[in-house]
């Protein structure tokens, strides 16, 4: 059986966004106390088209380029290219779409939404395993080898009714659903392709849904908490 997880109070920290000039710029140094720019090595092997996602683990950067080179590339923190992870193509061990990735326990997990598969690699890019998913999703996170969190939308999962109307669900290593989170009331949401709704930082998984002023945390036990509320001075997202 699976559980429906209620949201409880967490830090409840309010972030005051301040006044933004829609005709001006939002400068990073006004929002962050530290900003570091890294020039990535530019060789034929290391070129990246668009940076869609970056994860930093153990003095290395892992850069996702979903549409140009369709790959995850590994660099040092100084920007030196190390290796590519994953292989785009039509073969049985290749990705047809590099939708998302995460890093867990010295493994890189690449999600292929098109095939509903997870490709598991070593940090050096050696393929270890391919797992078939019974549902479709557009983001993933792995707390441990037996604890996954997935993010998806209804449009792709009418064949899997137990997760319909939920944005998030938690499974074991066999992808049996244990918890369902972030309920979406029927007729009161839109099926849109959201990007980077899940993000991990300092061993905590965060969830931010589109057009919301609230950032939630999700624990390995499936507890979901309000953590941060963005004060937009009476305006609504995405105003």
Residue ranges and their predicted role:
Residues 1-239:
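Eukaryotic scaffold repeat domains enriched in small/polar residues
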